Design a protein with these regions (language model features):
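Helix-to-loop transition at the C-terminal end of transmembrane segments
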Residues: 54-64, 190-195, 507-512
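Cytoplasmic/organellar membrane-interface segments at the starts of transmembrane helices
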Residues: 264-266, 407-408, 456, 460, ...
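Transmembrane helix-loop-helix hairpins at membrane boundaries of multipass inner-membrane proteins
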Residues: 1-15, 22-119, 200, 515-525, ...
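Hydrophobic transmembrane alpha-helices and their helix-loop junctions in integral membrane proteins
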Residues: 99-108, 125-138, 152-468
Length: 544
């Protein structure tokens, strides 16, 4: 990797972390609020540019990019390995964080502690990109902790509010238990497979090990199999998926989310619901499909391990179905606009889990496309709701009555996001739901399509309650002086609203050019993921 640009790609999370740590020091010297805000926006802009470069290189080169820290090759050193799957998700993270950073300037106007807000925001972005880019399961643990700790701090940003502190503590307690369980899974993985490198774990779980050999000093390097590995591998995967289901807020590990997300500032709620829960989704997908070859079960080295992976896929479908139905029902009885939207997140994570559990190309395409569509639409929904809350000073749906009449841009943005998430055409949410609907039928699970239809109907009714209240219901307060926000909040709304439409109308092209290649890299072309990691080792040691 001689291209300097590729080195910048590998250093993206460390660069963003450095920017985050430098901000409190800068704020000691520079007292200007606008400079601190500008620093936060520029920091997120740098991260977005680097994520765009990563996306471009992986799709242009069409093979994974491997970056070695300190020139230590895998499996000895920690590496970042970026294929089209995590590069695409990294692009979404970069864009949404940048828009949220701009939006936050006006939303938090007059609030103290803005330097800590942007420090934590940049830290969370660095952690999230680190989770996506890492090729090491222990480094994934570290980056999960970075992401989680910054999220706890941002949930507690309104530190004078009892609700925020209580929600942050609850979130931290549950998150700590989840990461501890994941650490136990890591101990099983390392004790059994003797490595923490994702590519080498993927190599050691496959029966096609003779295909993946690399000549190192005349000897072949390949996996050594013992029957105990099947039991250890299945146990490690089960523990890891349980931990990731907490991070993703998948039923029954969803209980922390409805308290944590509403308590945070609205731009942070957009990040938490739109992006942060997808960290768990990504980890589930990477473990299940890259490390344990769920889409190509015949590749697994042991029948018992295949059976365990199949059982876990069924569990994903069951839990996803329950998430969608339970969250859809709970949406309908909420009176707090942010709490209602938070339950919507649990419902959509359920859809994504169903797609992942199908282990078919179409199911995975539906899951990935819905992951992206939900990130965009949910960010828009929370940011639009945040404008209403910012103006009205309340999250009560009843007290927002009539505000939409004098805030047309905000209301239209909210409607676009709501209709997208409810699955109405021509918006992006409709397309990914239709893909999931078709995938269920192709898999012979047509009765489960009723879950999509019924839960979507619940969601549409819940969103209609908000739309009716803010647009058609008589105002309960004077609306004199109430209007749409300035460009700092309006531009992010407009961009996300346009994306909801474009991702819907241009879906055939996007699926063909972006989604399908990403799924191939994740689940069907794991040989390249393995080869690229070991090519680094071979080149350093004078290999092949």
């Amino acid at each position: 990797m001689n291209d300097p640009i590729l080195h910048l790609i590998g250093l993206t999370p460390p660069i963003v972390v450095a920017l985050a740590f430098a901000l409190p020091l800068l704020s000691l010297v520079v007292k200007s609020r606008s400079i601190v805000e500008g620093y936060g926006v520029v920091g997120s802009l740098i991260a977005m540019i680097l994520s765009v470069l990563t996306f471009y290189y992986t799709y242009f080169i069409k093979s994974p990019i491997v970056y070695t820290f300190g020139a230590w090759p895998p499996p000895i050193g920690i590496v970042y390995e970026v294929d089209r799957f995590n590069a695409l998700l990294g692009l979404v993270v970069g864009v949404v964080f940048f828009l949220v950073a701009i939006y936050s300037i006006e939303y938090l106007e007059g609030r103290e502690g803005i330097e800590w807000y942007y420090t934590l925001l940049l830290g969370m972005e660095a952690g999230m990109l680190g989770v996506l880019y890492t090729g090491d399961v222990f480094n994934l643990f570290v980056m999960l902790e970075v992401t989680s700790v910054t999220a706890y701090g941002l949930v507690a940003f309104y530190r004078s509010r009892k609700e925020s502190i209580e929600a942050a503590l609850k979130y931290a307690l549950v998150g700590s238990v989840a990461t501890t369980i994941y650490f136990i899974a890591l101990a099983l993985i390392y004790g059994s497979y003797g490595t923490l490198n994702m590519a080498q774990i993927a190599l050691k779980t496959t029966s096609s090990v003779d295909y993946f050999f690399f000549i190192l000093g005349g000897d072949k390097l390949w996996a050594v199999y013992t029957p105990a590995l099947a039991v250890a591998g299945a146990a490690a995967l089960a523990l890891a998926l349980w931990a990731f289901s907490v991070k993703a807020a998948l039923f029954p590990n969803h209980f922390w989310l409805p308290d944590a997300h509403p308590a945070a500032p609205s731009p942070i709620s957009a990040i938490l619901s739109g992006l942060l829960v997808k960290v768990g989704v990504y980890a589930i997908a990477r473990f299940t499909y890259t490390l344990f070859h769920a889409a190509q079960l015949s590749m697994l080295i042991d029948v018992a391990l295949r059976n365990a992976v199949e059982a876990l896929l069924i569990i994903l479908i069951v839990l996803g179905s329950l998430s969608a139905l339970v969250a859809g029902l709970l949406m309908m009885v909420q009176t707090d606009i942010k709490r209602l939207i938070a339950y919507s997140t649990i419902m959509h994570i359920g859809y994504i889990a169903i797609g992942l559990g199908l282990a078919t190309k179409l199911g995975l395409e539906a899951a990935l496309y819905h992951t992206i569509n939900h990130a965009v639409a949910k960010a828009l929904l929370f940011l639009a709701a945040g404008v209403f809350i910012h103006v009205a000073g309340t999250r009560s749906i009843d007290e927002l009555s009539g505000m939409g009449r004098v805030m047309p841009l905000t209301t239209i943005s909210f409607v676009i996001a709501a209709f997208s998430l409810a699955g109405l055409p021509p918006f992006n949410g409709f397309v990914s739901k239709y893909l999931l609907y078709t995938a269920l039928i192709d898999k012979g699970l047509a009765p489960l399509t009723l879950i999509i239809v019924i839960s979507s109907a619940f969601a549409l009714l819940a969103y209609s309650k908000i739309i009716y209240g803010v647009w058609l219901k008589a105002p309960t307060r004077s609306l004199e002086g109430v209007h749409d926000p300035t460009w700092k909040m309006s531009v992010p709304l407009l961009i996300l609203a346009i994306l909801c439409v474009v991702l819907g109308l241009a879906s055939p092209y996007i699926i063909e050019k972006l989604i399908t290649p990403a799924i191939i890299d994740l689940a069907y072309n794991t040989s390249d993921y393995i080869k690229e990691a070991f090519n680094i080792l071979a080149s350093i040691l004078g290999g092949r």
